[in-house]
Amino acid sequence: MLTDTAIRRLESIGQVAKSGKRINGLFRLMESEIVWLEAYARIYANKGAITQGVNQNTLDGFSYERVRTLINQLRDGTYHPKPTRRVFIPKANGKLRPLGLPTGDDKLVQEVVRILLEKIYEPLFSKYSHGFRPRRSTHTALDQIDSTWNGTKWIVNVDIQGFFDNMNHKLLLDLLSKKIEDKRFLNLIGSLLQAGYLEEWKFHGTYSGTPQGGICSPILSNIYLNELDIFLENLAKEFNTGARRRANPLYKHYTHRIRVIRKQVDAGMRDQKTVQEEISALEKVRRPLPSGDPLDPSFKRLHFCRYADDFVIGVIGSKREAEAIMGAVKTFISTTLKLNIAEEKSHIVHASKGTSFLGYTIKTYTGRKIIKTRRGSRHIRMKSVSKQLQLHIPAGRLEKFCTSKKYGNYQKLKARHRTQFLNQSEVEIISAYNAELRGLANYYALATGAKARISKLYRLWQVSLFKTLAAKRKTTVNKVATSLRLDDGGYGIHYQVKGQMRTLRLFRLKTWEQPRVDSSELDVEPNLALFIMTKSELIQRLNANKCEYCETETGPFEVHHVRGLKSIRPGKELWQRIMIARNRKTLILCKRCHQLLTAGKLPPPEALRCR
């Protein structure tokens, strides 16, 4: 398929899907090289790019020739995905999570499939779904709860047991076939699902679920659970009643008395100065009262928010109604989605008690939020009826973080140095410390009183950094602090790069600007031509048809990968120095140079230019 035709086809898929028509021609789109280049451009920089699966096939050595081989294999039916190599990685709770590592070719195929699925389903997904989606994140999920869940009385937690391991393959393919007509494309997804895995070099078949670590797994899980989103949206439409709460009778009584007095003033029956004290007294009595009736049975709402397989439901209503909602959701998950419920982790909690979601504690409190509004020619103040929902940093989270990073004793506020950094440069040490605390602070930026809560950890972090540098310099903490002091009161270190002086500042909580999600930007329609087919610098380099080592223009050309520039030490081979100078993890090489480099026999480029 021609490049322009492929791009136009990709741009139109979303609109066709939204119109309700089934999509065909996806397998033909996979025959376009431009889609494979885009797939490679999206994943080549990932840490796992050169991590091996069940064989030595990685993304290293990517080339047009390799793309054409894969396209031909798909076209003639000889492509068969390899089993993934299963490894186990530690979870936050100390347990292990299985991870499937595909081969390099399978990663490319999966990314192409993922791109096509995203074009079909992204316009169809619910606005309440936030996991593994463009321009959505844990922060957009939490911000949605923070901005729309006020007044929530009950929070329903339903935990799906082993979701990624137990997705029903037949049901998933049936769901896909509702939107996709291309049988060859569906069969390809089926073969990816059933490729199996090797654990300690013993093959295990996969008859359900998607491999965690697979590139397609996140979007396939969203397609599966989109059915749950649709169910909950329909349930909310049935449950939600009342445009607004009825007025609180007592609040209404005092409001009426104030209004009568003001009308008397307007009619000239009473003097404004003489009645002001009486009005102020009535307003003082009215102020603590909610303007609406929090127990109004005619006002009900159901909210929900999902991130991957983790979701919460907020209910404005009675506990009995929350229990009925929970029962309906459990039934749908077990019967329609054919998944199991973890009963011990599923519960209903009063919103004032709080619950955990995406690393935050979500809870309500009875606030004194005053709303200013206009009534006729006057401005009045009303107390909000809603209990204000807040996001909090969970108790013990900061101490746990402190312990894991070995900053010192959190309770006693006693810092210590970190021996693992003593062999690193001071720039590397400060950069590592900055990344740790800035990452934590940015994640909890939505929490109420985030700066105040983090301040204790910040002091411990700073002293730990000073002690680490003091141990490296073999001097005192005070001398380190003095040497790092900047004119504006902050701390930093001066260093040179290519003769130019630079300053690396220490993270400063006082001047830290808490980034907040702008939910309105989520509805902006992207430029699909730019979004889908961005020609990355890497692809431009590959299309230049020139070896970046020997400078030959005789192909074919391949992309050489390294794990990271830190693994390359200056002063060794010329090809390594080239990569450092260009600050790149990739190098475009002709096939001969790449083979010689891999074998450790790459001579100086002058010798190669004579060939």
Give the role of each language-model region.
Residues M1-R611:
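Non-catalytic terminal/accessory segments
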